[in-house]
């Protein structure tokens, strides 16, 4: 399906990279017109999903989900402390950055797998990101129910981590 998507995205004028193996998975990097970077990743263990019948994309090429998320930080220690001690994630592996500069550290939550991973690239020479076009200003994590949302909001507040509290997912 990555070949299909490379052609589809190029036909629509997006900047598309080459299909490459990143962290053991076939992946395709591309950018939207504002410079926002995205990656399509094949997942052989993906759960069976029902295709959308009205999609212009053939069923065998439809996207099944989101993940993993990749963030860039100037140094690992502060982010790792929050991920492990506040967010209860597990560090599961590292891999060489696809651009050849540094290491990407992989943290996992819940059952794991691409949709439950956060990849942290240590890139000290990058400028600090600004909010606006071409950037992501927040990430949302799924929880099973409302009591879990309230528990996480309380945990973050107790640890003095700024947070939005409960946000209805359909808002987006």
Which residues fall in each region the model found?
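Extended intrinsically disordered, low-complexity coil regions enriched in Ser, Thr, Gly, Ala
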Residues: 10-11, 50, 81, 88-101, ...
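Histidine (H) residue identity feature
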Residues: 61-64, 85, 101, 105, ...
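Conserved short beta-strand elements that form part of the metal-binding/catalytic scaffold
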Residues: 1, 30, 36-45, 92-135, ...
